[in-house]
């Protein structure tokens, strides 16, 4: 029986076919490596995410200005920025990506349900430094190419890959891939339930072999970061908690300055 992940992938295929990703816009990405930014961050390594809504919460932020949000995230110590470009379920847009790129010099991750090389072309055109690929999307056969081929296609465009998994089997296979960063999504994209223990369970049972592991979804406060870091995560992707804050920069500081505040 199809679940929400199937719906996401089917809608992504339709969005590609409808021409959503056809654009002539071009913005220079700069030589910004998300991998390097996370590994060398002087703060808690956070990828801050720009999005207006989510399937689980609905509207998160109604009238945000992408440039202003990106600048506030940068001022708050973000190592990198993720921009949702998926339009149907996350309220994302290609315009938000382009506007964020023009506003800051941080590495930018294009966050979408990517299954076509055309989406990689757009990521490059709009100034992304990295893209998200979801292991389960390719396991279910939605990719126009196989996962390893899509990673190669991203690398041929000088795009780094954050490869997302949700269970031990997926994570073990992601370790064998050529992905630059490994993501663990605490949200089950089939049922939309969230459990921070997903990261803990996976990293207790699978050796990450020194790779940067980004824990994603469900992070609300500093205690969550401490729990996930103790569990073995090395970086963190946070969206809703930041986008719903009255003061984005202050909220960013709550996350990025954890170690400094404890000294």
Regions found by a protein language model. Name each.
Residues 67-80, 127-129, 176-188, 231-234, ...:
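Structural recognition of alpha->loop->beta junctions
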Residues 115-127, 166-178, 210-215, 219-238, ...:
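Catalytic cores of alpha/beta
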Residues 1-61:
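An N-cap/entry alpha-helix motif that binds or orients negatively charged groups
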